Amino acid sequence: MALLITVVTCFMIILDTSQSCHTPDDFVAITSPGHIMIGGLFAIHEKMLSSDDHPRRPQIQKCAGFEISVFLQTLAMIHSIEMINNSTLLSGVKLGYEIYDTCTEVTAAMAATLRFLSKFNCSRETVVFQCDYSSYMPRVKAVIGAGYSETSIAVSRMLNLQLMPQVSYESTAEILSDKIRFPSFLRTVPSDFYQTKAMAHLIRQSGWNWIGAITTDDDYGRLALNTFAIQAAENNVCIAFKEVLPAFLSDNTIEVRINQTLEKIIAEAQVNVIVVFLRKFHVFNLFTKAIERKISKIWIASDNWSTATKIITIPNVKKLGKVVGFAFRRGNTSSFHSFLQTLHMYPNDNNKPLHEFAMLVSACKYIKDGDLSQCISNYSQATLTYDTTKTIENHLFKRNDFLWHYTEPGLIYSIQLAVFALGHAIRDLCQARDCKKPNAFQPWELLAVLKNVTFTDGRNSFHFDAHGDLNTGYDVVLWKETNGLMTVTKMAEYDLQRDVFITTNQETKHEFRKLKQILSKCSKECSPGQMKKATGSQHSCCYECVSCPENHYSNETDMDHCLLCNNETHWAPVRSTTCFEKEVEYLDWDDSLALLLIALSLLGIAFVLAIGIIFTRNLKTPVVKSSGGLVVCYVMLICHALNFASTGFFIGEPQDFACKTRQTLFGVSFTLCVSCILTKSLKILLAFSFDPKLTMFLKCLYRPVPIVLTCTGIQVVICTLWLVLAAPSVEENISLPRVIILECEEGSALAFGTMLGYITVLAFICFVFAFKGRKLPENYNEAKFLTFGMLIYFIAWITFIPVYTTTFGKYLPAVEIIVILISNYGILCCIFFPKCYIILCKQKTNTKSAFLQMVYNYSAHSVDSLALSHVSLDSTSYDTATTNQSPGNKMTACQNDNHLPAQVLPHTGTAKTIKASKTLRQKRSSSI
């Protein structure tokens, strides 16, 4: 194909090597008269040729690289204006147009803008400087264009001088939405803010977070890249590299920069997705070289080139990988298709691009449609051959389908909307004016109406928002190979307001899912149960995966941090993907330890019943009588039974009633039991006391019923205050990581301690009294056993304190149960078991005579000891008196001693002791 083009070129006859325009009219590309003139700016050529003059002169040069797609855009504007002229919208008012070729150069666009702003019907073609342009009549009333954002920015700054409406069909730079800087600019496409937002959303949804970006070094490229970078960061997407290419093909460094960009793409092997904000000719050159280097990636196309046929038809373009792009929402363009079918009959006298296209088609008449675009772009305005009009028409007729194939429906529709918006605004403005007159209205008046106009394309209604934008949305397109040809397929729609992709069928949904199979990440994906941990890289997308700690979880991939479980109700192990509900634990009835403790409690109750039966059947025996009688024994046995029964409230699911009952029941019943033991200790001590003063004191103190009631009553008051002021209650202990301990919270540690402390004080008093009576007769040694019982109690509860404070969990109640059982069994065994042993095994000693003999022997032994003590004491006194006293004093002493002789004093003392012994035996017998 290249050889054929070269051959054709060699036979060209160069007819024109002069400058592109001699007069301003030569600068006009397409023109048609009308009552109201509309300007148009289109980059019909992709570059302007450089001047060979030295030094360079300020002259407009010829252009090269005919852009078929942009040429079709000029035809779309012409067709849309003719649709309005042929309708009844303006009632006889005809719209005219002046369309200029910017050659993708801002300079050329500004030159055309100067002509737009020049004074109407002035032969000098000048822009008149004025302080007030309110009544100024320029050459045109409004401008459609330009396509590229950088050009529109420059043009808009000039049009702002007269507030001339400018409606762009393709410029998407976000900065143009700023109505302070660009008050007269409007557009029929969305801002790049929405496009970059949609791109970032697509990338995130596809699971990519490590991408590259390529843009141009101009206003559009820099602004688009900055906006995209912000949107990408908000979606946790990192840009591995940002490559910037020169804005114009005339730049000598563009080839070098493209090669450097491709080297960067190859070097970043983990980057498989690249966002491209470039012009069509940049993409064409980039892709051509990328195919040569066998680079295959996912290319995210901007709306500038996503549907460009020139790029889609690049040979072997499928080797580049997948192309996913965003295109302007398309509408009904069927009438434009019909217009193209009759293009060969359209007059081209005032349509230089059409005439040029016809000549290019003629020059490339032997080229196939697939290569025609490349052939056409190789010519410049200075290297064309001219043919007869009839021959040109024949070639155009043969190439009608080729033109339709190069149509970009989204852009064609946007141009139609721009023309329709102006048409409806002019209609509203001309309802009370004669718009056939050139001075019917000024451009700034049209701008005011245009901002608020509601217009239609025949089906849908539209209006500009506060920023002058028409947010029609985007089509998400995918390049697919069909029958050996690359085609553009609509994959989804992007809703700007809801920020969602709307798929139309199952096939497109499948295409979306296939995108997720491609990996483009800096780091390996963190699985559920892990979280990302930053590394030394400056990018947040480069990380390492670490497991979630205990009580944390992550249920999605690539989570930035693990989520905390609700520690009160849930838990999670290390590297968990979910939270598990905590198991509620308490000392349940089916627990082996609980069963053992209950068995011991029931055994204790059985012992109590057995002892009660034994005592009842042996009610008249001395052992039972010496124990205080059946009433005292029953009271103590009932207290023991209640103590054993209270352990049942420590087992099972805690309830408020059980929590309040268990400590109160134990405290009151155990206090009553200890109070009874206290009275027994006092009675024993009183019965066998030899000290007259102590005996008198114990007789005054010994009041059994008041002692029991008082001691027990104090404990009742303590427990009552406890229940009223800070009653125990059920509490969920959540301090353990995996379980909830359902337990009784004692309410007040002070009250709990006071209750136990009070019992301890009573037990200590009992211990002291019992210890004093530990040397009683062998068959009457109850005090000795009481001493052992109290010692067991003290040991048990002293051990309880550290064990209770250090034990945690569901077995905490078991600690108190064990202590209760030990203290209860200790007292029960020490008080009642010896008596039962005597009743059952030593019945001979369980008689009144045996007890009297035992008491007599003990009393005699006690009296002999007492007599010996008195004799020793009296002898010592006598010797002292004999040695130290005078005869007179001796006489006084004798008189004081009942007037007995001095030599019988020892015998007199012995007699008194024997008398006391008789009295003591009578007292012991009465106590029995």
Swiss-Prot record:
Coiled coil: none annotated. Belongs to the G-protein coupled receptor 3 family. It is found in: Cell membrane. Expressed at high level in liver, lung, spleen and heart. Expressed at lower level in kidney, skeletal muscle and brain. Expressed in 7 dpc, 11 dpc, 15 dpc and 17 dpc embryos. The chain crosses the membrane at residues 595-615, 631-651, 670-690, 707-727, 751-771, 785-805, 813-833. It is a multi-pass membrane protein. Disruption phenotype: Deficient mice shown normal body weight, an increased fat mass, decreased lean body, hyperglycemia and insulin resistance, proteinuria, renal calcium, phosphate wasting, impaired bone mineral density and defective testicular function. Conditional deletion in Leydig cells leads to decreased male fertility. Homodimer; disulfide-linked. One of its GO terms (cellular component) is plasma membrane. The keyword Cell membrane applies. One of its GO terms (biological process) is response to amino acid. Keywords: Cell membrane, Disulfide bond, G-protein coupled receptor, Glycoprotein, Membrane, Receptor, Signal, Transducer, Transmembrane, Transmembrane helix. One of its GO terms (molecular function) is G protein-coupled receptor activity. Residues 616-630, 691-706, 772-784, 834-928 are cytoplasmic. Receptor activated by multiple ligands, including osteocalcin (BGLAP), basic amino acids, and various cations. Activated by amino acids with a preference for basic amino acids such as L-Lys, L-Arg and L-ornithine but also by small and polar amino acids. The L-alpha amino acids respond is augmented by divalent cations Ca(2+) and Mg(2+). Seems to act through a G(q)/G(11) and G(i)-coupled pathway. This is G-protein coupled receptor family C group 6 member A. Residues 21-594, 652-669, 728-750, 806-812 are extracellular. The keyword RNA-binding does not apply. InterPro entries: ANF_lig-bd_rcpt, GPCR_3, GPCR_3_9-Cys_dom, GPCR_3_9-Cys_sf, GPCR_3_C, GPCR_3_Ca_sens_rcpt-rel, GPCR_3_CS, Peripla_BP_I. Residues 1-20 form the signal peptide. N-glycosylated. Glycans are attached at residues 332, 555, 567.
